[in-house]
Amino acid sequence: PERFEAGTPNIIGVCSLLSSIKVIKSIGFDKIELLEENLKKTLLDGLKGMPDIITYGDSNYKNRIGVVVFNVKDIHHDVISERLANFRGISIRNGTFCAHPYVRRLLNLKDEEFSKYAYSNKPRPGMLRVSLGLYNTKEEIEEFLNTLELVKEKDFRL
C-alpha cells in the first residue's frame, strides 16, 4: 500500500481518536448539540446586530453547523484577523479556507475576477471564519463580539 500513502501515517491521530470518542460519549451528544446551538445563536445574533457585518450562509442558526463566515464592510479580512490576534490573542481563520470555488461563489466573484489576484500584489478576496467547539463558552463568544466591535473601527490602533 506504500504507493497509496501520502506521507507519514497519523499514528497519534488514530490513537487519540478512541479517547476523543470516549470523552464525547461521556458528555453526551444531546448536551454538545445544545451547547453548540446556543453558541451559534449568540454569535450570529451578535454579528447580525452590527450593521457593517456581512454574514454568509443560512440565516437560520438551526440549519447551520458551528462554523460562521463573515466580512466587515470596507475592511479587508487580513486586517481584521490581524487586529483580533494582536489586540486580544483571538485567532480566527481568514482567506478562502482551501475552499476557493465556494468562497468565490459566496462573494459573487466570477472566475476571471478571482484569478486576476493570483499573480498580483493586491490583497486577495476572502472572508473571516469563526469555528465553535465543545470547549468554547458563551463568555468567549461575547468577548469575541466585544473585541470585534473595537477592532473594526477604521481608526483602531493597537
Regions found by a protein language model. Give the residues of each.
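Pyridoxal 5′-phosphate
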Residues: 1-158
